[in-house]
Design a protein with these regions (language model features):
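Class I SAM-binding transferase module
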Residues: 1-115, 122-123, 127, 133, ...
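Conserved SAM-binding loop of SAM-dependent methyltransferases across substrates and taxa
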Residues: 165-181
């Protein structure tokens, strides 16, 4: 198997250093270094005195004597390698101890995440910078193109759906300050613990500039503007239907992506909140995302999952989030068949016609829909069904223990200004989002 990283050093025919374990045997050493030739490795705190330097100079003028074999030369070279090894990347530092450690994917829609989980995600040095860039670019384009806003004051309305502890809200405020474009921000969060912290941030950090809402994003009706009419006013059949007290959102910001893009129900959540988005000019950040796969040889993961399968029959049918380490990529890149291939794509916002058909199916208004739970579902989510058939070219023989999954996301497409993108693919992460640590790859095991 081709090793992904260099192995440990293997020393052959190396015994104990002569005299090192004998207290009665004196060896010539240089201030604690195991060899006279190691003086070059010493720090400047052990530099020779002027007298010693003069003595060394006089010795150099004498005839050089043949040197004996240094019994500790291998230690000198190991120290040299240790000092000159490349600096670990951000992902290597963050993932230390997590290599090939199987984890179950998060389910933020079902579970309320703990504060420590939010804290880990907020340490990402790249993701939130990229989100801030995307929001700032969107605000600049909005102002330059003179698009109408959904706010009575003329401010661009931004909703952060699933705002957690508020890092995206902070970045949205920074983007507004950087671009000089006024914004009206709504933070929507269902987690009661995170909601309390959002209120605290709003009081202490954001100057009460944010409207904090405790709600599932799919049940949120939009920014509350005004009542339907004066209190006590009767509505008769002759009067027209009252206007909705809820406004629209210009920019919908979310971070619902999983390791395989859609595996944490991002499409379903964004479909459920799209009704608050302005129909003509509203945009979503991210605007699209794609899932990617490649076959891998992973004997360590295969062994771990096989042991789990003894007591858990679903172990081989469960996807795992894991920092892949002891693996080998079996596929090679050839024309038409790259090593890592795109599986499917989701785009937001969806066309209004697609959502209308989904709602009709939910209510049974379309032939074939409305079957209900007794028929296995009502078909309202059929537009999010995806399937793919991929062909990989493997040059060398090997056992495919599973499929490694990645994703790419376009946060904002600024046209000529370029795209703001995220990627976890090993061949594009450095170009699109170097040192991003928020997502490990996902591993789909195969029964062999």
């Amino acid at each position: 198997m081709r090793l992904k990283q260099a192995p440990w050093l293997l020393l052959c025919d190396v015994g104990p250093i002569p005299g090192l374990d004998d207290p009665n045997h004196l060896t010539s050493t240089a201030d604690g270094f195991p060899s006279p030739s190691a003086v070059a490795d010493a720090s400047r705190s052990v530099s020779p005195t002027p007298a010693e330097a003069a003595q060394l100079s006089s010795k150099e003028s004498q005839k050089l004597r043949p040197k004996t074999k240094d019994p500790a030369a291998h230690l000198i070279y190991i120290r040299y390698l240790q000092r000159n090894q490349p600096i670990r990347t951000a992902i290597e530092k963050f993932g230390s101890g997590y290599q090939d450690y199987l984890q179950a994917p998060l389910q933020p829609l079902t579970d309320n995440l703990e504060s420590v989980t939010y804290e880990v995600f907020e340490k990402d040095p790249v993701k939130y910078d990229w989100y801030e860039r995307a929001i700032a670019q969107a605000l600049s384009d909005w102002s330059e193109q003179r698009k109408p806003t959904s706010s009575p004051s003329g401010a661009v309305v931004i909703a952060v759906a699933g705002s957690g502890r508020g890092p995206l809200v902070t970045r949205a405020l920074r983007a507004s300050e950087m671009t000089g474009v006024a914004v009206e921000i709504w933070a929507v969060e269902k987690n009661p613990n995170a909601y309390v912290l959002l209120q605290r941030h709003n009081e202490e950090d954001w100057g009460r500039a944010v409207n904090v809402v405790k709600s599932d994003m799919r049940a949120w009706k939009g920014p509350l503007r005004a009542t339907t009419g004066p209190i006590g006013q009767a509505i008769t059949t002759a009067t027209s239907a009252p206007a909705s007290p809820y406004g629209k959102v210009d920019i919908l910001v979310s971070e619902l992506l999983g390791s395989f893009a859609d595996n944490e129900l991002s499409p379903e959540c964004l479909d459920g909140v799209q009704h608050v988005l302005a129909p003509q000019y509203g945009i979503s950040i991210p605007s699209s995302y794609t899932a990617h796969l490649t076959p891998v040889l992973a004997p360590r993961l295969h062994s771990d999952i096989s042991h789990r399968a003894i007591t858990d029959t679903t172990a081989t049918e469960t996807p795992y989030v894991v920092m892949l380490h002891a693996i080998d990529y079996l596929a090679t890149s050839v024309p038409g068949h790259p090593q890592v291939q795109e599986v499917w794509e989701f785009v937001h916002p969806l066309p209004s016609s697609t959502l209308a058909i989904a709602e009709a199916r939910r209510g049974g208004g379309v032939s074939g829909g409305g079957g209900g739970s007794m028929s296995g579902g009502d078909g309202a989510n059929e537009h999010n069904t995806r399937s793919a058939r991929l062909k990989f070219v493997c040059k060398d023989r090997g056992v495919v223990n599973g499929l490694a999954g990645y994703f790419e996301a376009v946060l904002y497409d600024g046209g000529e200004a370029g795209k703001v993108e995220l990627s976890t693919r090993p061949d594009t992460i450095d170009a699109k989002s170097k040192d991003m640590i928020s997502w490990f790859p996902i591993f789909f095991p195969l029964k062999v």
